Amino acid sequence: DHIKNAHMKGKRILIHMDLAEGIGRDRTGIDFLAGCGADGIISTRGQMIRYAKEAGLFTIQRFFALDSQGIGSMNESIDLSKPDMIEIMPGVIGKIIKRFSMGTIPVIAGGLIETKNEVTDAIRQGAIAVSTGNQKLWYV
């Protein structure tokens, strides 16, 4: 049994519910995982996080931080689902800008750019421009 072997080696088993095939994305699926000995779940779905918490599982809610509107909805979702941890993605946006800027299509960096340093960092990583609603940064 993979779960028992992992536990014997001091590892915790967290199931990514958004990617796991063959397991219902509902209360029954969560109960099944808890019965199998899984330690917790990862999911973008607040309802899955709530079900898992009710089943006594450890929870990580995953968020994609794309823009300031999305950040606002993250706070609301966290308040409703109360995960044990959150994962905010992407974690390495500078690296992604650099990778794509080496191609033939120009890259514009946008979303969550709030400071002059963030503008210059995006340009330094290879973006040709920055898209922001922050008027103070329009003339940087």
Give, region by region, the residue ranges found by the protein language model.
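Generic structural signal for hydrophobic
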Residues: 6, 33, 52, 77-78, ...
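Short beta-strand/loop segments at the ligand-binding rim of alpha/beta enzyme cores
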Residues: 6-18, 37, 55-64, 101-110
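Glycine-rich phosphate-binding active-site loops on the catalytic face of alpha/beta enzymes
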Residues: 47-48, 90-96, 111-140
